[in-house]
Amino acid sequence: MRIGYGYDSHAFAENRKLILSGIEIPYELGLKGHSDADAVIHALIDSILGALALGDIGSHFPDNDSKYKGISSIVLLEKTVSIMEEKNYEISNTDITIILEKPKLRNYIDTMRENLSKILKTDIENVSIKAKTNEKMDSIGRGEGIAVHCVSLLKKTK
């Protein structure tokens, strides 16, 4: 068993879609970033790579590489899952906390969990997602962006 921790944050931006866990969430703002800026998937990727002691998302998918400009983070997660499988590991479980003031995610959590479980090739019961506010404190509390924390436990397949 190996455990990894991931974190990501992005500022909100106009004229962008809000993509979280590969799902488009209706909102007037999206997240600023080189790719689709899916902070949930980015934190998840970092937790998997961290568990494998293989660095972080930027070392595998650099934001100064034009081939990743606007890319769906689902593609990056699929590549990360392939790396994990090549190392003979699979997800035991992952626990994700999304911190933002708006929009409220309650109605999207189950769809987000289902989408991630398919990409991770694991049962939905192994994927936990929670959404919290920052109680109006700091830049996230002022609604300027989002932060995501993720911990993943990997188990050997062989």
UniProtKB/Swiss-Prot annotation:
The record marks H34, T133 as: Transition state stabilizer. The keyword Lipoprotein does not apply. Keywords: Isoprene biosynthesis, Lyase, Metal-binding. Transmembrane segments: none annotated. SUPFAM superfamilies: IpsF-like (SSF69765). Involved in the biosynthesis of isopentenyl diphosphate (IPP) and dimethylallyl diphosphate (DMAPP), two major building blocks of isoprenoid compounds. Catalyzes the conversion of 4-diphosphocytidyl-2-C-methyl-D-erythritol 2-phosphate (CDP-ME2P) to 2-C-methyl-D-erythritol 2,4-cyclodiphosphate (ME-CPP) with a corresponding release of cytidine 5-monophosphate (CMP). A divalent metal cation binds at D8, H10, H42. It comes from Brachyspira hyodysenteriae (strain ATCC 49526 / WA1). It catalyses: 4-CDP-2-C-methyl-D-erythritol 2-phosphate = 2-C-methyl-D-erythritol 2,4-cyclic diphosphate + CMP. GO terms for molecular function: 2-C-methyl-D-erythritol 2,4-cyclodiphosphate synthase activity; metal ion binding. Its cofactor is a divalent metal cation. 4-CDP-2-C-methyl-D-erythritol 2-phosphate binds at D8, S9, H10, H34, S35, D56, I57, G58, F61, P62, D63, N64, D65, R142. The lineage of its organism: Bacteria, Pseudomonadati, Spirochaetota, Spirochaetia, Brachyspirales. This is 2-C-methyl-D-erythritol 2,4-cyclodiphosphate synthase. Pathway: Isoprenoid biosynthesis; isopentenyl diphosphate biosynthesis via DXP pathway; isopentenyl diphosphate from 1-deoxy-D-xylulose 5-phosphate: step 4/6. Its EC number is 4.6.1.12. Pfam families: YgbB (PF02542). Homotrimer. It is an enzyme of class 4 (lyase). InterPro entries: MECDP_synthase, MECDP_synthase_CS, MECDP_synthase_sf. Belongs to the IspF family. Binds 1 divalent metal cation per subunit. PROSITE patterns: ISPF (PS01350). One of its GO terms (biological process) is terpenoid biosynthetic process. It comes from the Bacteria.
